[in-house]
C-alpha cells in the first residue's frame, strides 16, 4: 500500500455535524477499500481563501494522511467530486523514503 496526503476544503456554511459526517464518510471509504487512516491535521479550521470559489471567500481546511491502494484514491476522488460539501481537494502520493 502507498501513503497518500489528501487536502480538502469544505464549504464554510456547513454545520459542525455535517462536517463530522463528511469526514466520517471519507474515513469509511478508506477502510472499506482496505486502507489505513494515519492521521489528520484538522487544526486549520476555517480560513480565508486566496480567491472566491462558488461565491465563498472562506473554507474549512483539512489535511489527512492515509495508506491505500490506487482504487481507494479513485473512489475518494469520485465521491468528493459529486459531493456539494467540497470546494476543492487534492490527493498526492507520498514518496517512499
UniProtKB/Swiss-Prot annotation:
Cited InterPro entries:
Ribosomal_bS6 (IPR000529), Ribosomal_bS6_sf (IPR035980), Ribosomal_S6_plastid/chlpt (IPR020814), Transl_elong_EF1B/ribsomal_bS6 (IPR014717)
List the GO cellular component terms. Answer: cytoplasm; ribonucleoprotein complex; ribosome
**UniProt GO BP:** translation
Q: Does the keyword RNA-binding apply?
A: yes
Family listed: Belongs to the bacterial ribosomal protein bS6 family.
Query: What's a Gene Ontology MF term here?
Result: small ribosomal subunit rRNA binding
Do the record's keywords include Nucleus? no
* Species this protein is from: Syntrophomonas wolfei subsp. wolfei (strain DSM 2245B / Goettingen)
Q: Which UniProt keywords apply?
A: Ribonucleoprotein, Ribosomal protein, RNA-binding, rRNA-binding
Q: Which NCBIfam families match?
A: S6
Q: Which domain of life is it from?
A: Bacteria
Pfam families the record matches: Ribosomal_S6
Q: What is the name of the protein in this document?
A: Small ribosomal subunit protein bS6
Q: What is the annotated role of this protein in its UniProt record?
A: Binds together with bS18 to 16S ribosomal RNA.
